């Protein structure tokens, strides 16, 4: 490859690293072209799987500010550049590797953090981002409902207290009216007639 072509390839790969939420490095030795095509289909639209040259990709990673991958650029390497959900891509790679043991996950970088192959496997065991967000929203809704109940309880207690005071005053004034009339009648009876 001529120098201008290498420079262009490095720039393209560096841009892939910058635009990706994750980049997973794999060894693809022993996979057929049809298996690689199937893997690309498995990863879907949120990822691009590319066979790369180690030296050029190492330089591109450095240019993109991606660190911690130097030891992974050994042997035949392909990179899954993920622009979508990293968990879904990790699941796709894990499932494909189970069916095709020739695919070996070496490691990668997820949202700027270098990860080992074991960490990528653990990432694949997580639930998808959408499911985790739904669970978080459900937990927050339950917490908010509880908080609303806590805030509403004192208000309803104040309303019940105000109603009880109003009823008590009404019954006191009703009880005081006959007593006041009886007192006036008694005073009138005791008073000498002129």
Swiss-Prot record:
Organism: Frankia alni (strain DSM 45986 / CECT 9034 / ACN14a)
Superkingdom of the organism of origin: Bacteria
Spans through the membrane: none
Region annotation Disordered: where it falls in the sequence: 167-194
Keyword Transport attached: no
Name by which UniProt lists this protein: Large ribosomal subunit protein uL10
Gene Ontology BP term (one): translation
Subunit structure: Part of the ribosomal stalk of the 50S ribosomal subunit. The N-terminus interacts with L11 and the large rRNA to form the base of the stalk. The C-terminus forms an elongated spine to which L12 dimers bind in a sequential fashion forming a multimeric L10(L12)X complex.
Stated family: Belongs to the universal ribosomal protein uL10 family.
CDD domains named among the record's database cross-references: Ribosomal_L10
Keyword annotations of the record: Ribonucleoprotein, Ribosomal protein, RNA-binding, rRNA-binding
Gene Ontology MF, one: large ribosomal subunit rRNA binding
Biased composition (Low complexity): 174-194
This protein's record includes keyword Metal-binding: no
General function of this protein: Forms part of the ribosomal stalk, playing a central role in the interaction of the ribosome with GTP-bound translation factors.
SUPFAM superfamilies in UniProt: Ribosomal protein L10-like
Gene3D superfamilies, sorted: 3.30.70.1730, 6.10.250.290
Coiled coil: none
NCBIfam families recorded: PRK00099.1-1
InterPro entries in alphabetical order: Ribosomal_uL10 (IPR001790), Ribosomal_uL10-like_sf (IPR043141), Ribosomal_uL10_bac (IPR022973), Ribosomal_uL10_bac_type (IPR047865), Ribosomal_uL10_CS_bac (IPR002363)
């Amino acid at each position: 490859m001529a120098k201008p072509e290498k420079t262009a390839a490095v720039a393209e790969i560096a841009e892939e690293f910058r635009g990706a939420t994750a980049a997973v490095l794999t060894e693809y030795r022993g996979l057929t072209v049809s298996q690689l095509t199937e893997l690309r289909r498995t990863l879907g639209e949120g990822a691009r799987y590319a066979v790369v040259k180690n030296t050029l990709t190492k330089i591109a990673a450095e240019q993109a500010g991606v660190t911690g991958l130097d030891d992974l650029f050994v042997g035949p390497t392909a990179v899954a550049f993920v622009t979508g959900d990293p968990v879904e891509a990790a699941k796709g790679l894990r499932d494909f590797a189970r069916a095709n043991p020739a695919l070996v996950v070496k490691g990668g970088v997820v949202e700027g953090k270098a990860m080992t192959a074991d960490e990528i496997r653990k990432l694949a065991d997580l639930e998808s981002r959408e499911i985790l967000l739904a669970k978080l929203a459900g937990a927050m809704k339950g917490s908010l409902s509880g908080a609303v109940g806590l805030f509403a309880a004192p208000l309803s207690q104040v309303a019940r207290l105000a109603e009880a005071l109003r009823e008590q005053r009404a019954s006191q004034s009703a009880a005081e009216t006959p007593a006041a009339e009886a007192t006036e009648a008694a005073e009138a009876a005791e008073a000498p007639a002129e």
